[in-house]
A protein has these predicted regions:
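Extended charged low-complexity segments that act as oligomerization/scaffolding linkers
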Residues: 2-44, 79, 83-139
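Short, surface-exposed basic-aromatic patches at helix termini and helix-loop junctions that form
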Residues: 60-61, 79-91, 190, 209-218
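Short glycine-rich phosphate-binding loop at a beta-alpha junction
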Residues: 64-71, 195-198
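PRPP/pyrophosphate-binding module of the type I phosphoribosyltransferase fold
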Residues: 1, 143-218
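Glycine-rich phosphate-binding "P-loop"
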Residues: 31-47, 161-176
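An acidic- and aromatic-residue-enriched active-site/binding cleft used to recognize and process polar
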Residues: 1, 72-73, 95-98, 200-203
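A short, well-structured juxtamembrane/interface segment
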Residues: 47-61, 177-188
Length: 218
């Protein structure tokens, strides 16, 4: 009954077994599940199960003191991880690629500007919205920038020039945020010698940035 909507691309043995499990759960009539639940089970269930098992094996084999699950994307992983391995001592922590980008701006200004502004040009957001997302609008509100105009390939270079003209002040703003993050993570990592961070992003920039901050800046 449910096979046309079941995931493919797996080996015949694993695919058949997983489709059978999904069909038995979703089509037995005992309970009606939401579409969001069905989608998560079908498209992410097997991945999450395998990923959590990999994380746990890695933590044991490398004698990890604490596993960190980053906010938002890591929430469901943390919940499944706790179901599979209760009392594991892992932590769900506040962290994001945006926060990492701002707190490591001093390391690579070009990368900061590229990801914070250049990649957003042509998406429909205004110059003001771009500055607000970077926590920089109060610093530049008196500058002659086209705040109400959509961010595009032309005005993004004007924005870059303005930011470069006040770069030390930009870094000072982010240094204050970094100090707050330092206090937060000091409590999270207290007593730990080896920590593993779980980052869903394909680049892994969140985990790499946190490692750099913890080992070199904090």
């Amino acid at each position: 009954l449910g096979n046309p909507a079941r995931p493919g691309g797996m080996s015949p043995l694993v695919g058949s077994a997983y489709r059978g499990i999904c069909n038995a759960l979703l089509c037995c009539g005992r309970k009606k599940y939401s579409l969001a639940y069905e989608y998560g089970l079908l498209r992410g269930g097997l991945f999450v199960l395998g990923y959590c098992h990999f994380i746990h094996r890695y933590a044991i084999s490398h004698q990890i003191d604490r596993v960190l699950f980053f906010s938002r994307d890591g929430e469901i992983l943390k919940r499944v991880y706790d179901l599979l391995y209760p009392g594991n001592g892992s932590k769900y922590v506040a962290w994001s690629r945006l926060a990492a980008l701002k707190m490591t701006a001093h390391r690579n200004p070009s990368l900061f500007f590229e990801r914070m502004f250049l990649h957003k040009s042509g998406t429909g957001i205004t110059v003001k919205q771009a500055l607000l997302s970077a926590d920089l609008y109060p610093l530049f509100r008196s500058h002659p920038l086209p705040f109400s105009s959509p961010l595009d390939r032309k005005n993004v270079h004007l924005l870059q020039k303005a930011i470069r003209s006040r770069w030390p002040e930009v870094l000072q703003i982010y240094a204050q945020q970094s100090q707050a993050a330092k206090q937060y993570y000091h409590a999270v990592l207290e007593g730990c010698k080896k920590v593993c961070a779980v980052d869903i992003g394909w680049v892994g920039s969140g985990a790499i940035s946190l490692m750099q901050l913890a080992e070199q800046d904090w």
